[in-house]
Amino acid sequence: MDGADVMSELLTTLSRELGEDAVLGGPDVSDKYAVDVSGENPLKPIAVVLPRSTADVATILRHCSEAGQPVVVQGGLTGLSGGATPQPGELALSLERMSGVESLDRASMTLTALSGTPLQVIQEAAEEAGLLFPLDLGARGTCQLGGLIATNAGGNQVIRFGMIRNLVLGLEAVLADGTVISSMNRMLKNNAGYDLKQLFIGTEGTLGVVTRAVLRLFPRLPGKCTALCALDSFAGVVELLRAVQANIGSSLSAYEVMWASYFDYVIEHVGTLRSPFERTYPLYALIETEGTDTAHDAERFESTLGSALESGVIQDAVIAQSQQDVQSFWAIRDGIAEITSALMPYASLDVSMAVADMPGFLDQVDEKLAARFGPVTNLVFGHVGDNNLHLFITTGREADVDPILDAVYKITGDYQGSVSAEHGIGALKREYLHYSRSSEELELMRRLKRTLDPNGILNGGRVI
């Protein structure tokens, strides 16, 4: 049979075993399956299959493996690295129908959910039980659990709770040949052999498809304190971070730093935003803590910032007095979503490195880009407490975007940093992975891929 006949037979088989409504082809494949949020290289898949259970996923992958049919796994399509965007000849396996919280155990503080469950649904289920699922992203209403696990998502509270890798106790995944690996562990301690779930966390669907997961929950804490601080040096940023950690400890839940390039640009271009400071400063730190004793936590918070102000570590600070203040501070930090259209065309980077290397790295970026491209707008902010910087760089010329990416990723490699801190590699960063991984590491990744997916059908052309 030729390729068309093989595909026709495959879709007929899947329709018979899963139901006709589980297989979309031809005009029934909508544009929403053509591209993720990156917007790069949109292409409709040749068909879309919509499983409702782990057994359905196993059936799909078994038949696709036997037919040699490439598969792209899709969730909420909120990724920024092109990992869920179809490539030529691929069938899309969409997890959107595998949605729902299966159980919540208050005693163990765990929640079990299907991989197509939106993050916000998980957060709300935890909140209704008086608990907290701490991972939070701007795309919370759309992004799905499976994609979060596949990319090892981070968010604003990594400094306290870690990446999602730290929040997953167990999971269920389906290998490329349809084998189901059920490792639905619910314990914090389990050293019974290899921790197989790690094969599927952060590997972007290249080694298997996550279908269910057991997540850690935490107590909700009433004592939230938020402040926006102004600083005149990166040394002050580091000193303030260490002071907060020393005096407030594990209550620190967010430490977001904005360089003036970003802060001033957002204030200027988003009409609803206002700076709480009378003048501009080189750097700004948004700090948030969450504790158990509202009055005591607020006292320690104010005392720590007061000492930093008196010693000259910070030049000014505004402590939130209401939820409206909290929202206005975070609106500045999250203002990037409001200004990307004004920046177009731009290079977006999500990198990480040792905190001490950040000033030198940024100086190198500015110097080398200016020498090569002339005037450059470089907006910088990030989760400095967990080594992560986000850069949005533009010259106003589309032709400069790819050369800028290559130049900055090379500098990242020179500082032994990572070309992807939290957004994944996908298809768009694949060519830059060698800046952050040795040839031996890359070969080991390829060996794992060949072992678990010998026919190479799962998310090919991504990561490695």
Give the positions of each predicted feature.
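N-terminal accessory segments
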Residues: 1-37, 67-69, 308-324, 414-419, ...
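C-terminal substrate-recognition/cap domain of FAD-linked oxidoreductases
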Residues: 25-33, 215, 219, 230-233, ...
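Activity-critical C-terminal alpha-helical subdomain
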Residues: 179, 430-464
